[in-house]
A protein has these predicted regions:
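Charge-dense, helix-prone N-terminal extensions
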Residues: 2-163
């Protein structure tokens, strides 16, 4: 009986690990900002980012997981067979910095990053202390490149605005 319980526990843990934790929620974006962001300047930056990203993507801001504000969605399938959905562009107003989630591996994206302004970067995120530290037109270009790249490779809800 004990071995069966251990196997069942292991199976549940493996299933939980395989599930994508960053999924759309019904949590209100405004309520999240009020509850999660205690710095008024960061809250103002977050509201400005929401306004810009909604305009740039044509999508309404939506909560993804407990702390990511995403715009649009796309479906991905890895070679391993793991599949899921993710926001096309997103950000999280964390304590240390605004964390931006945009695809940055195209040539245009790399050129924009070189001139974006003051930020730090990890493999998948751009960290910005204040929106005033970066060029918003270059951030727009990064968002457009994300939409372009993702819509070429995945089923994507976002469309580039018509010129």
């Amino acid at each position: 009986m004990r071995k069966w319980r251990e196997k069942a526990n292991l199976h549940q843990r493996l299933q939980a690990m395989a599930q994508n934790k960053t999924t759309p929620t019904t949590q209100s974006v405004a309520a999240f900002l009020e509850a999660f962001v205690d710095n008024e300047a960061k809250k103002a930056d977050a509201r400005a980012l929401i306004e810009h990203m909604e305009a740039w993507t044509g999508e309404t801001a939506k909560m993804w997981g407990p702390s990511i504000i995403g715009f649009g969605s796309y479906h991905y399938v890895y070679a391993s067979g793991h599949a899921g959905d993710a926001p096309v562009v997103a950000f999280s107003p964390r304590k240390a910095a605004l964390t931006l989630y945009v695809y940055s591996e195209t040539e245009k994206s790399k050129a924009a990053l070189a001139q974006l302004g003051k930020f730090k970067m990890s493999k998948a995120c751009i960290y910005v202390k204040r929106l005033a530290d970066i060029d918003l037109q270059l951030l727009r270009l990064l968002c457009e490149e994300s939409i372009r790249y993702i819509s070429e490779h995945h089923a994507c809800s976002c469309r580039l605005p018509q010129a």
